[in-house]
UniProtKB/Swiss-Prot annotation:
UniProt protein name: Peroxisomal biogenesis factor 19
Organism, as annotated: Pongo abelii (Sumatran orangutan)
A GO molecular-function descriptor: ATPase binding
Propeptide: 297-299
Membrane disposition: Lipid-anchor
Signal peptide: none
Region (Docking to the peroxisome membrane and binding to PEX3) location: 2-56
Lipid addition sites, S-farnesyl cysteine: C296
Family from the record: Belongs to the peroxin-19 family.
Origin organism lineage: Eukaryota, Metazoa, Chordata, Craniata, Vertebrata
A GO term from the CC aspect: nucleus
Length: 299
């Protein structure tokens, strides 16, 4: 019996020593294990060689980076971001279907960098660009139905700084889509509605102090604004594509009439919340081009 207990004690001691030996070996292994290599700062080329970005990808990234300033000149803060997002969405869809057209838009963007660094030169180019966008939107349908030849469309592209346009006509509905987003109810209606609600009281209080001609112009301006609001208020989720198109053309025509009537009273436009910069001359939606505008319009 005593011999058995002695043998058990020796076995237990041997097991404990073996366990300690194993734990020590594991600790030594962990200490000797090399630390992981730092992540490489370069991407290893695959079997086909280094990856190259397509010209369309490069042009698209550059275009998205440069177009935001354009929308900042049309809108303030939140609405500028909204317009930028709409533009990027349209351009991403275009890039998937027609990457070469994105490159053409990039050439237009590069043309902006050639106009000079002074403020006057930049403003002239911005005005030119806005007039061109308006012309594309207003005349998109007419151009598509006119059977314009490839040579004529190429010349039109060149007028936009797209020297190597390949004659694809898909740019026209794309630009019309962008303009539809910029002249949408979400963008225009809140500010216009606020002005139209304040306009009657303002007209009544300034009737005696304004020249008759100016008073009549403000009355007409108020009437046109009300018509634009009525167009937006008539929108329904079930509107057909034909109805939406007709409404857009009507809103664009009314906005052009507003431009012809000049600025609204500062007391009204100045009270608008952050959003639309109601500067119709700056928007330059259409109307008779000036000396510089004659070189910008391609229609």
């Amino acid at each position: 019996m005593a011999a058995a207990e002695e043998d058990y004690g020796v076995g237990a001691e041997a097991d404990r020593e073996l366990e300690e030996l194993l734990e020590s070996a594991l600790d030594d292994f962990d200490k000797a294990k090399p630390s992981p290599a730092p992540p490489s700062t370069t991407t290893a080329p695959d079997a086909s060689g280094p990856q190259k970005r397509s010209p369309g990808d490069t042009a698209k990234d550059s275009l998205f980076a440069s177009q935001e300033k354009f929308f900042q000149e049309l809108f303030d803060s939140e609405l500028a971001s909204q317009a930028t997002a709409e533009f990027e969405k349209a351009m991403k869809e275009l890039a998937e279907e027609e990457p070469h057209l994105v490159e053409q838009f990039q050439k237009l963007s590069e043309a902006a960098g050639r106009v000079g660094s002074d403020m006057t030169s930049q403003q002239e180019f911005t005005s030119c660009l806005k007039e061109t966008l308006s012309g594309l939107a207003k005349n998109a349908t007419d151009l598509q139905n006119s059977g314009m030849s490839e040579e004529e469309l190429t010349k039109a592209m060149e007028g936009l700084g797209m020297d190597e346009g390949d004659g694809e006509g898909n740019i026209l509905p794309i630009m019309q889509s962008i303009m539809q987003n910029l002249l949408s109810k979400d963008v225009l209606y809140p500010s216009l509605k606020e002005i139209t609600e304040k306009y009657p009281e303002w007209l009544q209080s300034h009737r005696e102090s304004l020249p008759p001609e100016q008073f009549e112009k403000y009355q007409e301006q108020h009437s046109v604004m009300c018509k634009i609001c009525e167009q937006f208020e008539a929108e329904t989720p079930t509107d057909s594509e034909t109805t939406q198109k007709a409404r857009f053309e009507m809103v664009l025509d009314l906005m052009q009439q507003l431009q012809d009537l000049g600025h609204p009273p500062k007391e009204l436009a100045g009270e608008m919340p952050p959003g639309l910069n109601f500067d119709l001359d700056a928007l330059n939606l259409s109307g008779p081009p000036g000396a510089s505008g004659e070189q910008c319009l391609i229609m």
